[in-house]
Protein backbone atom coordinates (compact mmCIF):
# COMPACT_ATOMS: atom_id res chain seq x y z
CA UNK A 1 0.00 0.00 0.00
CA UNK A 2 2.94 2.32 0.70
CA UNK A 3 4.22 1.83 -2.83
CA UNK A 4 0.75 2.38 -4.30
CA UNK A 5 0.33 5.53 -2.24
CA UNK A 6 3.67 6.88 -3.42
CA UNK A 7 2.79 6.21 -7.06
CA UNK A 8 -0.59 7.88 -6.61
CA UNK A 9 1.05 10.92 -5.07
CA UNK A 10 3.56 11.11 -7.93
CA UNK A 11 0.74 10.91 -10.47
CA UNK A 12 -1.24 13.60 -8.67
CA UNK A 13 1.71 15.99 -8.73
CA UNK A 14 2.45 15.35 -12.41
CA UNK A 15 -1.04 14.64 -13.74
CA UNK A 16 -1.15 17.08 -16.66
CA UNK A 17 2.29 16.29 -18.16
CA UNK A 18 1.66 12.57 -17.68
CA UNK A 19 -1.70 12.69 -19.46
CA UNK A 20 -0.12 14.75 -22.23
CA UNK A 21 2.68 12.22 -22.79
CA UNK A 22 0.13 9.40 -22.81
CA UNK A 23 -2.01 11.22 -25.39
CA UNK A 24 1.06 11.79 -27.56
CA UNK A 25 1.51 8.04 -27.75
CA UNK A 26 -2.10 7.77 -28.86
CA UNK A 27 -0.97 9.69 -31.97
CA UNK A 28 1.90 7.24 -32.33
CA UNK A 29 -0.55 4.33 -32.25
CA UNK A 30 -2.86 5.92 -34.82
CA UNK A 31 0.04 6.30 -37.22
CA UNK A 32 1.61 2.88 -36.74
CA UNK A 33 -1.41 0.72 -37.57
CA UNK A 34 -3.17 2.31 -40.54
CA UNK A 35 -0.91 0.94 -43.30
CA UNK A 36 -1.81 -2.73 -42.79
CA UNK A 37 -5.56 -2.68 -43.50
CA UNK A 38 -5.26 0.02 -46.19
CA UNK A 39 -2.41 -1.76 -47.98
CA UNK A 40 -4.41 -2.99 -50.97
CA UNK A 41 -6.23 0.32 -51.40
CA UNK A 42 -2.91 2.18 -51.31
CA UNK A 43 -1.57 -0.25 -53.91
CA UNK A 44 -4.49 0.65 -56.15
CA UNK A 45 -3.99 4.34 -55.45
CA UNK A 46 -0.28 4.22 -56.32
CA UNK A 47 -0.48 1.43 -58.96
CA UNK A 48 2.30 -0.53 -57.27
CA UNK A 49 3.18 -4.15 -56.60
CA UNK A 50 3.57 -5.68 -53.14
CA UNK A 51 7.39 -5.33 -53.10
CA UNK A 52 7.02 -1.71 -54.21
CA UNK A 53 4.46 -0.84 -51.54
CA UNK A 54 6.69 -2.60 -48.99
CA UNK A 55 9.12 0.27 -49.45
CA UNK A 56 6.50 2.49 -47.85
CA UNK A 57 6.75 0.39 -44.68
CA UNK A 58 10.53 0.52 -44.98
CA UNK A 59 10.58 4.30 -45.32
CA UNK A 60 8.32 4.70 -42.28
CA UNK A 61 10.40 2.42 -40.09
CA UNK A 62 13.74 3.78 -41.32
CA UNK A 63 12.70 7.32 -40.49
CA UNK A 64 11.15 6.15 -37.22
CA UNK A 65 14.59 4.78 -36.37
CA UNK A 66 16.28 8.03 -37.39
CA UNK A 67 13.71 10.00 -35.42
CA UNK A 68 14.34 7.84 -32.35
CA UNK A 69 18.08 8.40 -32.62
CA UNK A 70 17.74 12.13 -33.25
CA UNK A 71 15.05 12.53 -30.60
CA UNK A 72 17.77 12.76 -27.98
CA UNK A 73 18.68 16.16 -29.39
CA UNK A 74 15.27 17.50 -28.35
CA UNK A 75 15.12 16.05 -24.84
CA UNK A 76 17.86 18.16 -23.29
CA UNK A 77 15.36 20.64 -21.82
CA UNK A 78 11.67 20.56 -21.12
CA UNK A 79 10.99 23.31 -23.67
CA UNK A 80 12.77 21.45 -26.46
CA UNK A 81 10.94 18.25 -25.59
CA UNK A 82 7.49 19.81 -25.62
CA UNK A 83 8.08 21.77 -28.82
CA UNK A 84 9.34 18.59 -30.49
CA UNK A 85 6.23 16.72 -29.36
CA UNK A 86 3.94 19.53 -30.54
CA UNK A 87 5.57 19.61 -33.98
CA UNK A 88 5.57 15.81 -34.30
CA UNK A 89 1.90 15.35 -33.42
CA UNK A 90 0.90 18.19 -35.75
CA UNK A 91 2.92 16.60 -38.57
CA UNK A 92 1.04 13.32 -38.07
CA UNK A 93 -2.29 15.08 -38.64
CA UNK A 94 -0.92 16.77 -41.75
CA UNK A 95 0.37 13.45 -43.09
CA UNK A 96 -3.05 11.84 -42.67
CA UNK A 97 -4.61 14.73 -44.58
CA UNK A 98 -2.09 14.54 -47.45
CA UNK A 99 -1.99 10.75 -48.02
CA UNK A 100 -5.10 10.66 -50.29
CA UNK A 101 -3.34 13.00 -52.72
CA UNK A 102 -0.29 10.73 -53.14
CA UNK A 103 -0.79 8.79 -56.39
CA UNK A 104 2.84 7.78 -56.82
CA UNK A 105 4.48 5.24 -54.54
CA UNK A 106 7.63 7.37 -54.21
CA UNK A 107 5.63 10.39 -53.11
CA UNK A 108 3.65 8.24 -50.67
CA UNK A 109 6.88 6.77 -49.25
CA UNK A 110 8.26 10.29 -48.75
CA UNK A 111 5.14 11.44 -46.91
CA UNK A 112 5.07 8.32 -44.73
CA UNK A 113 8.78 8.84 -44.03
CA UNK A 114 7.97 12.27 -42.61
CA UNK A 115 5.43 10.63 -40.32
CA UNK A 116 8.11 8.12 -39.32
CA UNK A 117 10.43 10.92 -38.22
CA UNK A 118 7.65 12.38 -36.09
CA UNK A 119 6.88 8.97 -34.57
CA UNK A 120 10.53 8.34 -33.72
CA UNK A 121 10.81 11.70 -32.00
CA UNK A 122 7.64 10.94 -30.01
CA UNK A 123 8.96 7.50 -29.06
CA UNK A 124 12.22 8.74 -27.55
CA UNK A 125 11.07 12.02 -26.02
CA UNK A 126 7.86 10.80 -24.37
CA UNK A 127 9.54 7.68 -22.95
CA UNK A 128 12.40 9.73 -21.54
CA UNK A 129 10.19 12.43 -20.05
CA UNK A 130 8.23 9.81 -18.12
CA UNK A 131 11.43 8.09 -16.96
CA UNK A 132 12.82 11.48 -15.93
CA UNK A 133 9.71 12.28 -13.87
CA UNK A 134 9.08 8.89 -12.23
CA UNK A 135 12.51 7.21 -12.43
CA UNK A 136 12.42 3.95 -10.40
CA UNK A 137 8.62 4.04 -10.35
CA UNK A 138 8.39 4.46 -14.13
CA UNK A 139 7.49 0.82 -14.96
CA UNK A 140 3.81 1.35 -14.16
CA UNK A 141 3.60 4.56 -16.18
CA UNK A 142 5.45 3.02 -19.13
CA UNK A 143 2.85 0.24 -19.22
CA UNK A 144 0.08 2.86 -19.39
CA UNK A 145 2.04 4.77 -22.03
CA UNK A 146 2.15 1.73 -24.29
CA UNK A 147 -1.50 1.03 -23.54
CA UNK A 148 -2.25 4.29 -25.32
CA UNK A 149 -0.19 3.09 -28.30
CA UNK A 150 -2.47 0.08 -28.48
CA UNK A 151 -5.55 2.27 -28.10
CA UNK A 152 -4.56 4.41 -31.07
CA UNK A 153 -3.54 1.37 -33.10
CA UNK A 154 -6.89 -0.28 -32.32
CA UNK A 155 -8.86 2.77 -33.43
CA UNK A 156 -6.96 3.27 -36.68
CA UNK A 157 -8.04 0.02 -38.44
CA UNK A 158 -11.59 0.41 -37.10
CA UNK A 159 -11.82 3.83 -38.73
CA UNK A 160 -10.40 2.51 -41.99
CA UNK A 161 -12.50 -0.67 -42.21
CA UNK A 162 -15.83 0.86 -43.42
CA UNK A 163 -13.98 2.63 -46.23
CA UNK A 164 -11.96 -0.34 -47.54
CA UNK A 165 -12.63 -1.45 -51.09
CA UNK A 166 -14.18 -4.92 -51.28
CA UNK A 167 -12.72 -5.60 -54.72
CA UNK A 168 -9.01 -6.25 -55.18
CA UNK A 169 -7.67 -4.36 -58.18
CA UNK A 170 -4.60 -6.60 -58.22
CA UNK A 171 -4.65 -10.38 -58.54
CA UNK A 172 -2.91 -12.06 -55.65
CA UNK A 173 0.78 -12.88 -55.69
CA UNK A 174 1.66 -12.60 -59.36
CA UNK A 175 4.64 -11.02 -61.03
CA UNK A 176 4.62 -7.28 -61.41
CA UNK A 177 4.13 -7.32 -65.19
CA UNK A 178 1.34 -9.90 -65.05
CA UNK A 179 -0.33 -8.01 -62.27
CA UNK A 180 -0.16 -4.75 -64.14
CA UNK A 181 -1.48 -6.24 -67.40
CA UNK A 182 -4.39 -8.03 -65.74
CA UNK A 183 -5.33 -4.98 -63.70
CA UNK A 184 -5.12 -2.67 -66.72
CA UNK A 185 -7.34 -4.95 -68.80
CA UNK A 186 -9.97 -5.23 -66.09
CA UNK A 187 -10.04 -1.51 -65.37
CA UNK A 188 -10.24 -0.55 -69.01
CA UNK A 189 -13.06 -2.99 -69.63
CA UNK A 190 -15.07 -1.17 -66.97
CA UNK A 191 -14.27 2.40 -67.91
CA UNK A 192 -13.31 2.40 -71.58
CA UNK A 193 -14.47 0.79 -74.79
CA UNK A 194 -11.17 -0.84 -75.66
CA UNK A 195 -8.26 -2.35 -73.77
CA UNK A 196 -4.57 -2.16 -74.47
CA UNK A 197 -1.54 -3.88 -72.93
CA UNK A 198 0.32 -2.11 -70.18
CA UNK A 199 3.90 -2.39 -69.10
CA UNK A 200 4.98 -2.29 -65.48
CA UNK A 201 4.00 0.92 -63.63
CA UNK A 202 2.09 2.45 -66.58
CA UNK A 203 -1.45 1.72 -65.42
CA UNK A 204 -4.00 4.51 -66.03
CA UNK A 205 -4.50 6.54 -62.88
CA UNK A 206 -8.12 7.58 -63.01
CA UNK A 207 -10.02 4.47 -61.84
CA UNK A 208 -7.92 3.79 -58.72
CA UNK A 209 -8.01 7.50 -57.92
CA UNK A 210 -11.79 7.52 -57.97
CA UNK A 211 -12.01 4.52 -55.67
CA UNK A 212 -9.56 6.03 -53.21
CA UNK A 213 -11.14 9.49 -53.15
CA UNK A 214 -14.61 8.10 -52.59
CA UNK A 215 -13.65 5.69 -49.82
CA UNK A 216 -10.23 5.44 -48.15
CA UNK A 217 -9.59 9.17 -48.30
CA UNK A 218 -12.33 9.78 -45.74
CA UNK A 219 -10.68 7.38 -43.30
CA UNK A 220 -7.41 9.32 -43.43
CA UNK A 221 -9.16 12.66 -43.02
CA UNK A 222 -11.13 11.35 -40.03
CA UNK A 223 -7.89 10.19 -38.39
CA UNK A 224 -6.35 13.61 -39.05
CA UNK A 225 -9.24 15.29 -37.20
CA UNK A 226 -9.18 12.79 -34.32
CA UNK A 227 -5.48 13.45 -33.82
CA UNK A 228 -5.77 17.27 -33.74
CA UNK A 229 -6.57 17.53 -29.98
CA UNK A 230 -3.19 15.96 -29.18
CA UNK A 231 -0.97 18.83 -30.42
CA UNK A 232 -3.43 21.20 -28.75
CA UNK A 233 -2.88 19.35 -25.45
CA UNK A 234 0.90 19.72 -25.85
CA UNK A 235 0.44 23.41 -26.62
CA UNK A 236 -1.65 23.79 -23.47
CA UNK A 237 1.11 22.16 -21.42
CA UNK A 238 3.63 24.55 -22.97
CA UNK A 239 1.38 27.42 -21.95
CA UNK A 240 1.02 26.11 -18.41
CA UNK A 241 4.79 25.76 -18.06
CA UNK A 242 5.12 29.31 -19.47
CA UNK A 243 7.37 28.10 -22.27
CA UNK A 244 5.57 29.82 -25.15
CA UNK A 245 7.59 33.05 -24.83
CA UNK A 246 11.31 33.11 -25.43
CA UNK A 247 12.01 35.66 -22.71
CA UNK A 248 10.62 33.44 -19.97
CA UNK A 249 12.00 30.15 -21.22
CA UNK A 250 15.42 29.98 -19.66
CA UNK A 251 14.72 30.63 -15.98
CA UNK A 252 11.58 28.51 -15.98
CA UNK A 253 13.33 25.49 -17.48
CA UNK A 254 15.38 25.18 -14.32
CA UNK A 255 12.21 25.32 -12.28
CA UNK A 256 10.60 22.60 -14.37
CA UNK A 257 13.62 20.32 -14.11
CA UNK A 258 13.83 20.85 -10.36
CA UNK A 259 10.13 20.07 -10.07
CA UNK A 260 10.74 16.69 -11.72
CA UNK A 261 13.34 15.91 -9.06
CA UNK A 262 11.18 17.19 -6.22
CA UNK A 263 8.49 14.64 -7.06
CA UNK A 264 10.77 11.95 -5.71
CA UNK A 265 10.05 10.95 -2.08
CA UNK A 266 12.70 11.56 0.53
CA UNK A 267 13.04 7.97 1.74
CA UNK A 268 16.56 6.73 2.25
CA UNK A 269 16.14 3.77 -0.07
CA UNK A 270 15.32 6.09 -3.00
CA UNK A 271 18.50 8.17 -2.88
CA UNK A 272 19.42 6.74 -6.27
CA UNK A 273 17.01 9.29 -7.70
CA UNK A 274 19.75 11.87 -7.12
CA UNK A 275 21.83 10.25 -9.84
CA UNK A 276 20.98 12.85 -12.50
CA UNK A 277 22.59 15.56 -10.35
CA UNK A 278 25.84 13.64 -10.21
CA UNK A 279 25.68 12.59 -13.86
CA UNK A 280 24.03 15.51 -15.59
CA UNK A 281 24.41 14.13 -19.11
CA UNK A 282 23.67 10.46 -18.64
CA UNK A 283 19.95 10.88 -18.95
CA UNK A 284 20.04 13.49 -21.69
CA UNK A 285 22.30 12.03 -24.38
CA UNK A 286 21.23 11.09 -27.88
CA UNK A 287 22.32 7.90 -29.59
CA UNK A 288 25.47 9.41 -31.04
CA UNK A 289 26.62 10.85 -27.71
CA UNK A 290 25.98 7.49 -26.08
CA UNK A 291 28.43 5.79 -28.43
CA UNK A 292 31.38 7.85 -27.21
CA UNK A 293 34.16 5.79 -25.68
CA UNK A 294 34.27 7.80 -22.46
CA UNK A 295 30.79 6.55 -21.53
CA UNK A 296 31.99 2.94 -21.43
CA UNK A 297 35.28 3.35 -19.57
CA UNK A 298 35.57 0.58 -17.00
CA UNK A 299 32.42 -1.23 -18.14
CA UNK A 300 32.49 -5.06 -17.94
CA UNK A 301 31.81 -7.19 -21.01
CA UNK A 302 28.42 -8.17 -19.61
CA UNK A 303 27.38 -4.50 -19.79
CA UNK A 304 27.67 -4.53 -23.58
CA UNK A 305 26.22 -8.04 -23.86
CA UNK A 306 23.09 -7.02 -21.93
CA UNK A 307 22.61 -4.02 -24.22
CA UNK A 308 23.00 -6.14 -27.35
CA UNK A 309 20.81 -9.07 -26.30
CA UNK A 310 18.04 -6.85 -24.90
CA UNK A 311 18.02 -4.83 -28.12
CA UNK A 312 17.94 -8.05 -30.18
CA UNK A 313 14.92 -9.34 -28.24
CA UNK A 314 13.08 -6.10 -29.01
CA UNK A 315 14.39 -6.25 -32.59
CA UNK A 316 12.53 -9.54 -33.01
CA UNK A 317 9.38 -8.86 -30.98
CA UNK A 318 8.72 -5.33 -32.25
CA UNK A 319 9.63 -6.49 -35.75
CA UNK A 320 7.08 -9.30 -35.49
CA UNK A 321 4.46 -6.88 -34.22
CA UNK A 322 4.99 -4.53 -37.13
CA UNK A 323 5.20 -7.28 -39.76
CA UNK A 324 2.12 -9.12 -38.51
CA UNK A 325 0.05 -5.95 -38.34
CA UNK A 326 1.20 -4.97 -41.83
CA UNK A 327 0.67 -8.27 -43.65
CA UNK A 328 -1.99 -10.27 -41.80
CA UNK A 329 -4.65 -8.60 -43.95
CA UNK A 330 -2.83 -9.51 -47.18
CA UNK A 331 -2.26 -13.05 -45.87
CA UNK A 332 -5.93 -13.53 -45.03
CA UNK A 333 -7.32 -12.47 -48.42
CA UNK A 334 -5.02 -14.82 -50.34
CA UNK A 335 -5.29 -18.58 -50.74
CA UNK A 336 -5.74 -20.93 -48.97
CA UNK A 337 -7.95 -18.85 -46.64
CA UNK A 338 -9.35 -16.34 -49.19
CA UNK A 339 -11.24 -14.36 -46.54
CA UNK A 340 -13.41 -11.49 -47.78
CA UNK A 341 -11.82 -8.06 -47.70
CA UNK A 342 -14.27 -6.65 -45.15
CA UNK A 343 -13.83 -9.61 -42.80
CA UNK A 344 -10.05 -9.58 -43.19
CA UNK A 345 -10.09 -5.87 -42.36
CA UNK A 346 -11.06 -6.77 -38.80
CA UNK A 347 -7.84 -8.76 -38.26
CA UNK A 348 -5.56 -5.73 -37.70
CA UNK A 349 -8.21 -4.25 -35.39
CA UNK A 350 -8.43 -7.54 -33.48
CA UNK A 351 -4.64 -7.71 -33.25
CA UNK A 352 -4.27 -4.19 -31.90
CA UNK A 353 -7.35 -4.58 -29.75
CA UNK A 354 -5.77 -7.45 -27.86
CA UNK A 355 -2.48 -5.57 -27.71
CA UNK A 356 -4.43 -2.80 -26.00
CA UNK A 357 -6.16 -5.29 -23.71
CA UNK A 358 -2.84 -6.92 -22.87
CA UNK A 359 -1.28 -3.59 -21.99
CA UNK A 360 -4.28 -2.72 -19.85
CA UNK A 361 -3.96 -6.05 -18.01
CA UNK A 362 -0.21 -5.58 -17.61
CA UNK A 363 -0.69 -2.30 -15.72
CA UNK A 364 -1.74 -4.00 -12.43
CA UNK A 365 0.24 -7.16 -13.21
CA UNK A 366 3.49 -5.18 -13.55
CA UNK A 367 3.28 -4.14 -9.89
CA UNK A 368 3.03 -7.78 -8.77
CA UNK A 369 5.17 -9.70 -11.26
CA UNK A 370 8.82 -9.21 -12.11
CA UNK A 371 9.48 -7.76 -15.58
CA UNK A 372 11.79 -10.68 -16.40
CA UNK A 373 8.94 -13.13 -15.79
CA UNK A 374 6.56 -11.10 -17.93
CA UNK A 375 9.01 -11.04 -20.83
CA UNK A 376 9.55 -14.81 -20.56
CA UNK A 377 5.80 -15.50 -20.66
CA UNK A 378 5.39 -13.15 -23.61
CA UNK A 379 8.18 -14.66 -25.72
CA UNK A 380 7.12 -18.27 -25.06
CA UNK A 381 3.51 -17.37 -25.84
CA UNK A 382 4.52 -15.81 -29.15
CA UNK A 383 6.43 -18.93 -30.24
CA UNK A 384 3.59 -21.28 -29.27
CA UNK A 385 0.99 -19.09 -31.01
CA UNK A 386 2.91 -18.97 -34.28
CA UNK A 387 3.39 -22.75 -34.17
CA UNK A 388 -0.35 -23.24 -33.69
CA UNK A 389 -1.12 -20.81 -36.52
CA UNK A 390 1.22 -22.82 -38.73
CA UNK A 391 -0.40 -26.13 -37.79
CA UNK A 392 -3.96 -24.80 -38.33
CA UNK A 393 -3.07 -22.62 -41.32
CA UNK A 394 -6.25 -23.68 -43.19
CA UNK A 395 -8.59 -22.78 -40.32
CA UNK A 396 -10.15 -19.32 -40.63
CA UNK A 397 -11.49 -19.31 -37.08
CA UNK A 398 -8.10 -20.15 -35.61
CA UNK A 399 -6.53 -17.30 -37.58
CA UNK A 400 -8.74 -14.90 -35.60
CA UNK A 401 -8.03 -16.75 -32.33
CA UNK A 402 -4.29 -16.83 -33.03
CA UNK A 403 -4.26 -13.15 -33.98
CA UNK A 404 -5.87 -12.26 -30.65
CA UNK A 405 -3.44 -14.51 -28.76
CA UNK A 406 -0.45 -13.04 -30.56
CA UNK A 407 -1.54 -9.50 -29.75
CA UNK A 408 -1.97 -10.44 -26.10
CA UNK A 409 1.54 -11.90 -25.79
CA UNK A 410 3.31 -9.16 -27.75
CA UNK A 411 1.50 -6.39 -25.90
CA UNK A 412 3.74 -5.76 -22.90
CA UNK A 413 7.08 -7.02 -24.21
CA UNK A 414 8.59 -3.60 -24.88
CA UNK A 415 7.70 -1.85 -21.59
CA UNK A 416 8.55 -4.99 -19.61
CA UNK A 417 11.95 -5.27 -21.29
CA UNK A 418 12.55 -1.58 -20.64
CA UNK A 419 11.74 -2.06 -16.94
CA UNK A 420 13.84 -5.24 -16.77
CA UNK A 421 16.94 -3.59 -18.19
CA UNK A 422 16.37 -0.64 -15.85
CA UNK A 423 16.49 -3.08 -12.94
CA UNK A 424 19.77 -4.51 -14.23
CA UNK A 425 21.64 -1.37 -15.27
CA UNK A 426 19.78 1.59 -13.72
CA UNK A 427 18.79 2.83 -17.18
CA UNK A 428 18.51 6.62 -17.61
CA UNK A 429 18.20 7.88 -21.18
CA UNK A 430 21.19 6.52 -22.98
CA UNK A 431 20.26 2.85 -22.65
CA UNK A 432 16.60 3.63 -23.29
CA UNK A 433 17.65 5.15 -26.59
CA UNK A 434 19.57 1.95 -27.44
CA UNK A 435 16.48 -0.20 -26.82
CA UNK A 436 14.18 2.13 -28.75
CA UNK A 437 16.66 2.11 -31.63
CA UNK A 438 16.89 -1.69 -31.61
CA UNK A 439 13.12 -2.00 -31.70
CA UNK A 440 12.93 0.52 -34.53
CA UNK A 441 15.51 -1.36 -36.60
CA UNK A 442 13.53 -4.56 -36.07
CA UNK A 443 10.29 -3.03 -37.30
CA UNK A 444 12.06 -1.58 -40.33
CA UNK A 445 14.02 -4.68 -41.36
CA UNK A 446 11.50 -7.42 -40.59
CA UNK A 447 8.61 -5.67 -42.33
CA UNK A 448 10.71 -5.26 -45.46
CA UNK A 449 12.01 -8.83 -45.24
CA UNK A 450 8.56 -10.35 -44.72
CA UNK A 451 7.18 -8.33 -47.64
CA UNK A 452 9.86 -9.61 -50.00
CA UNK A 453 9.53 -13.24 -48.83
CA UNK A 454 5.74 -13.03 -48.95
CA UNK A 455 5.86 -11.91 -52.58
CA UNK A 456 8.49 -14.47 -53.61
CA UNK A 457 7.38 -17.57 -51.67
CA UNK A 458 3.66 -17.10 -51.15
CA UNK A 459 1.38 -16.60 -48.17
CA UNK A 460 2.51 -19.71 -46.25
CA UNK A 461 5.95 -18.16 -45.73
CA UNK A 462 4.30 -15.44 -43.61
CA UNK A 463 3.74 -17.87 -40.72
CA UNK A 464 7.09 -19.62 -41.21
CA UNK A 465 8.83 -16.26 -40.78
CA UNK A 466 6.86 -15.71 -37.56
CA UNK A 467 8.01 -19.04 -36.11
CA UNK A 468 11.65 -18.32 -36.99
CA UNK A 469 11.58 -14.81 -35.54
CA UNK A 470 9.85 -16.03 -32.37
CA UNK A 471 12.46 -18.74 -31.80
CA UNK A 472 15.27 -16.23 -32.31
CA UNK A 473 13.65 -13.89 -29.76
CA UNK A 474 13.52 -16.75 -27.24
CA UNK A 475 17.20 -17.60 -27.83
CA UNK A 476 18.26 -13.98 -27.37
CA UNK A 477 16.21 -13.74 -24.17
CA UNK A 478 17.91 -16.83 -22.71
CA UNK A 479 21.26 -15.20 -23.51
CA UNK A 480 20.09 -12.02 -21.76
CA UNK A 481 19.24 -14.01 -18.63
CA UNK A 482 22.71 -15.58 -18.73
CA UNK A 483 24.48 -12.22 -19.05
CA UNK A 484 22.32 -10.80 -16.26
CA UNK A 485 23.46 -13.64 -14.01
CA UNK A 486 27.16 -13.00 -14.65
CA UNK A 487 26.86 -9.20 -14.59
CA UNK A 488 28.59 -7.70 -11.51
CA UNK A 489 26.27 -5.98 -9.05
CA UNK A 490 27.83 -2.54 -9.37
CA UNK A 491 24.63 -0.56 -9.20
CA UNK A 492 24.14 -0.98 -5.46
CA UNK A 493 27.70 0.14 -4.73
CA UNK A 494 27.30 3.13 -6.98
CA UNK A 495 24.03 4.07 -5.31
CA UNK A 496 25.59 3.90 -1.84
CA UNK A 497 28.51 6.07 -2.92
CA UNK A 498 26.23 8.67 -4.39
CA UNK A 499 24.05 8.68 -1.29
CA UNK A 500 27.17 9.72 0.62
CA UNK A 501 27.98 12.39 -1.95
CA UNK A 502 30.93 10.45 -3.37
CA UNK A 503 31.49 9.96 -7.08
CA UNK A 504 33.42 7.02 -8.49
CA UNK A 505 35.09 8.15 -11.71
CA UNK A 506 35.91 4.58 -12.70
CA UNK A 507 32.24 3.58 -12.92
CA UNK A 508 30.72 3.56 -16.37
CA UNK A 509 27.77 5.76 -17.22
CA UNK A 510 24.33 4.21 -17.50
Swiss-Prot record:
Q: How does it sit in the membrane?
A: Multi-pass membrane protein
| Keywords for the protein's UniProt record, in alphabetical order | Membrane, Transmembrane, Transmembrane helix, Transport
Q: Which InterPro entries match?
A: MFS (IPR011701), MFS_trans_sf (IPR036259)
Q: Looking at the Swiss-Prot or TrEMBL record, what is one Pfam family this protein matches?
A: MFS_1
User: Which locations, inside or outside the cell, does it occupy?
Assistant: Membrane
The GO molecular function terms of this record are:
transmembrane transporter activity
- List the CDD domains hit by this protein, alphabetically: MFS_MFSD4A (cd17453)
Query: Where is it found, in Gene Ontology cellular component terms?
Result: membrane
From the record, give the transmembrane residue ranges: 19-39, 53-73, 82-102, 107-127, 139-159, 218-238, 303-323, 345-365, 380-400, 401-421, 434-454, 462-482
- Database matches in PANTHER family: MAJOR FACILITATOR SUPERFAMILY DOMAIN-CONTAINING PROTEIN 4A, SODIUM-DEPENDENT GLUCOSE TRANSPORTER 1
Which family does the similarity line name? Belongs to the major facilitator superfamily.
Q: What is this protein called?
A: Major facilitator superfamily domain-containing protein 4A
Q: Report the gene name.
A: Mfsd4a
Amino acid sequence: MGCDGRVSELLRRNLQPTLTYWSVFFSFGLCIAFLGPTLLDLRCQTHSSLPQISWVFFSQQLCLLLGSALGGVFKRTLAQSLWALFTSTLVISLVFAVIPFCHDVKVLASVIALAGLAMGCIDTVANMQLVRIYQKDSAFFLQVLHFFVGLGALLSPLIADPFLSEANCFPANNTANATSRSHGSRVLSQHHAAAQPWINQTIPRLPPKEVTENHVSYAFWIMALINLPVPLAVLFLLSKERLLTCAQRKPLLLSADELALETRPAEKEDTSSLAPKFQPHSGQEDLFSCCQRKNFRGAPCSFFAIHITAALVLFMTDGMMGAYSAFVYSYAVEKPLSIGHKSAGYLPSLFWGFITLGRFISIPVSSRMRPATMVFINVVGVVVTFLMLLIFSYNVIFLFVGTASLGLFLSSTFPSMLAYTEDILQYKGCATTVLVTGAGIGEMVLQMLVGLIFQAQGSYSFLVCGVIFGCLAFIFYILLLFFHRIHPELSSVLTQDKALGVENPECYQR
